[in-house]
Regions:
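Catalytic cores and adjacent flexible loops of soluble metabolic enzymes
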Residues: 1-246
Length: 246
């Protein structure tokens, strides 16, 4: 028992396997009452609708949606300008907010999370602009905060540069008090832990990590190393690694 209280269980709209895993966890009663599940979805209408089907019956859910915002992907993949990319995000936010209301009225604790994928490759002023637009379309308030998750994606800059970006972002976003700033560091340069630590110093409040750094390509930030490093600095990460060998 490590004590992790928010766990991403998959991408239920991406495959039938992920969908069935999500349903089994909910229907089989495998989720502790004090644990929030998180599900990932692209900012696409049919995938969002499938995701809402997958989470029915859950008690505590973070619905995490994303679209890419980098200069490269805007040009090469989407062939869109910034207005077009922002519309993808805000249309998704509108749909998610609308579909969430009946579930919230029925008692589901449902929170929202948005990631500008390839944040490192996005102009910071545009990253601020699109995230602020999403906050507004999700009706974020200081009492009902939205998680803004800032991924390193392919980690194409150094940890200190990422910290500078993050500090700038936190200072410039108008609705800072209505957002929880989250990090999602990958480890392509082998700097995932350093990036997370620098990001926390620069203003982040939350880190998405994996056990032992398991993840795509060279992995994600290792929550064990990150947490143990925090212990060495006198900070209690509120995680229990006493049985880590098992």
């Amino acid at each position: 028992y490590i004590g992790i209280k928010e766990i991403e269980i998959g991408f239920p709209s991406a495959s039938e396997t992920d969908y069935e895993i999500c349903r089994e966890l909910i229907e089989g009663g495998h989720i502790p009452d004090d644990v929030t599940i998180q599900v990932l979805v692209q900012a696409r209408e049919h995938l969002i609708k499938k995701t809402f089907e997958a989470i029915r019956g859950a008690k505590h859910v973070i619905l995490h949606f994303y679209n890419s915002t980098s200069t490269l992907q805007r040009k090469v993949v989407f062939h869109m300008d910034t207005d077009g990319i922002t519309k993808i995000a805000t249309d998704a936010a509108d749909l998610i907010y609308e579909m969430a209301q009946p579930l919230i009225r029925e008692g589901m604790d449902l929170r929202f999370e948005y990631s500008p994928e390839s944040f490192m490759g996005t102009e910071m002023d545009y990253a601020v602009e699109i995230c602020q637009a999403v906050l507004e379309h999700l009706h974020a308030t200081p009492e009902n905060k939205v998680i803004l998750n800032l991924p390193t994606t392919v980690e194409n800059c150094m940890p200190n540069q990422f910290a500078d970006m993050l500090e700038y972002f936190c200072k410039k976003i108008p609705s800072r008090d209505s957002a929880i700033i989250s990090l999602h560091p990958h480890n392509d340069r082998g700097c995932g832990v350093a990036t997370a630590e620098m990001g926390l110093l620069a203003g982040a409040e939350r880190v998405e990590a994996t056990l032992f750094g398991n993840g795509e390509r060279t992995g994600n930030v290792d929550i064990v190393t990150l947490a143990m490093n925090m212990y060495t600095q006198g900070i209690d990460p509120k995680l229990d690694f006493s049985n880590i060998n098992k």
